[in-house]
Amino acid sequence: MLMATDAIGSDAVHIPVMRARILDLLAVVLKSGRRVHVDGTLGMGGHAEAVLRRFPDVELVGIDRDQQALTMAEARLEPFADRVHLVHAVHDELPEVLDDLGLDYVDSVLLDLGLSSFQIDEVERGFSYSVDSPLDMRMDQSSGRTAAQILNESDPGALVRMLREYGEEKFADRIVRAIVTERDRQPIETSGRLVEIITEAIPATVRRKRHSHPAKRTFQALRIAVNREMETLPAVLPRALDRLDVGGRIAVLSYHSLEDRPVKEAFRDACADTAPAGLPMVPESMAAKFNPVTRGAERPDADEVATNPRSASARLRVIERVRPGPVNRQHATKESR
């Protein structure tokens, strides 16, 4: 893990999703005293800046795997430098980050699982199917396999599973056959070429009926695989819950069902008691350690969606620790096997 150093400027614009609602939900714990807030997906620092401005006594721990976004956030948060700790790490390294800072517990945690506008629009990243660019898709460009390497080197069966599991793509077999045919001729290196392959593989009648871009599901699956998102998310949730102090809150923004499902399950387990069925009363030691704050998942209102269309699919879940002790990890345990 490396501390952020070189600050750089940027003209990129990123509108933090559900910013006002998140601030209101965290205000209960952050409004008084020297509190510690963790932004485990700092990005360009939009949510973090809002927290620091509204709560002048809050100390921020900002974590991100994307060094370029992290340095942009460092420049943005310079006015609050005496209250900010920025760390280059993946969010599932949260316990190690806090240990290095000498923090046993924190008061709030925010995880925004979406890409920033900067990442989507950055030509050299390859996240977007609307711009022709090198197929990279790594949030941390200093390590890991690129999307091009996965496409060109993976077994066809593994690619089919990836598209089905991470993209929920019905035409995974057809798309992978087309990918294999093309890569046998020459490596697939750019997003533009991949979009052409996908578009040609999906029947025209289906393309006309789909409300989204034909490449959307494949690009989502590739991004998830490149960044191991379905490994790090189930790992960070119980670790973040463990480090929340009593009265602390955790807020998670997800953008599709694959992200929302493990969040929903982890939060449901954390808010459940561990007493056997049939007991006339739940012993205090078995009582739920967390309570829900939001009723299910909240969505952005119509005004926000109109202003920031990329927020349309967002789902916000928040729970609060009400008792000390380990949480019920039924689903977290399953994911880690």
Swiss-Prot record:
Pfam families tied to this protein: Methyltransf_5
Record field: catalytic activity: cytidine(1402) in 16S rRNA + S-adenosyl-L-methionine = N(4)-methylcytidine(1402) in 16S rRNA + S-adenosyl-L-homocysteine + H(+)
Record GO cellular component, one term: cytoplasm
Domain of life: Bacteria
UniProt EC number: 2.1.1.199
Entry GO MF terms: rRNA (cytosine-N4-)-methyltransferase activity
Keyword S-adenosyl-L-methionine carried by entry: yes
Location within or outside the cell: Cytoplasm
Listed SUPFAM superfamilies: Putative methyltransferase TM0872, insert domain, S-adenosyl-L-methionine-dependent methyltransferases
Top EC category: transferase
Keyword rRNA processing among UniProt keywords: yes
Gene Ontology biological-process entries: rRNA base methylation
Keyword tags: Cytoplasm, Methyltransferase, rRNA processing, S-adenosyl-L-methionine, Transferase
Family classification: Belongs to the methyltransferase superfamily. RsmH family.
UniProt cross-references to PANTHER family, sorted A to Z: 12S RRNA N4-METHYLCYTIDINE METHYLTRANSFERASE, S-ADENOSYL-METHYLTRANSFERASE MRAW
Protein name as catalogued: Ribosomal RNA small subunit methyltransferase H
